Regions:
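Contiguous beta-strand/loop segments that form the cofactor/metal-binding neighborhood of enzyme cores
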Residues: 8-84, 104, 114-126
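C-terminal "lid/loop" region of Rossmann-like NAD(P)-dependent oxidoreductases
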Residues: 96-106
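Active-site substrate-recognition segment that forms the wall
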Residues: 109
Length: 155
């Protein structure tokens, strides 16, 4: 699985999922299109107590690149490309309650992750203003679950 879409790209969609829903999901399933034992495309589906989240990552495949986090009362939609967006929407069945949130984002979102990484190196102790220790550990655990082949369905 080394060098595939999960190992190279999964950290990007995992961060907003964990920010919105937390790291305490009930289970996760992966659906992967393999080529020479490397996942070229993977869809992951998380089940939480009161929500579902999914993401798709790929190498050499095209996908919309949007992000959707579904819940029991509505869902969060971040348009493509979600890692560069400057707004997201919270949508409900009654569209009168829908709301768009705008925020300033200088450059690409990766810029903020790099900043936190540099600050962690330059300061004593573990410091991440945007990504918590718990979120980082769970990102690594999701990768481990995938690498060990747990709940991985090859297409």
């Amino acid at each position: 699985y080394f060098g595939g879409s999960m190992s190279e790209n999964a950290c990007f969609p995992l961060l907003p999922i964990f920010k919105f829903l937390g790291t305490k999901f009930r289970n996760i399933n992966f659906y992967s299109k393999m080529k020479n034992d490397v996942d070229m495309f993977t869809k992951a589906v998380f089940r939480y107590d009161h929500a579902v989240a999914s993401f798709q990552v790929g190498l050499g495949v095209k996908t919309e690149g949007s992000l959707t986090i579904a819940g029991t009362k509505g869902y969060v939609y971040v348009p493509a490309p979600w890692w560069k967006t400057d707004y997201f929407e919270v949508r409900y069945e009654d569209q009168n309650y829908n709301k768009k949130y705008f925020y300033p984002y200088v450059g690409e979102g990766l810029r903020y992750e790099i900043k936190d990484f540099v600050v962690a190196i330059l300061t004593d102790g573990y410091y991440f203003s945007k990504v918590s220790k718990e979120e980082n550990l769970m990102m690594a655990e999701v990768q481990e679950i995938y690498i060990l082949g747990k709940n991985v369905y090859k297409l």
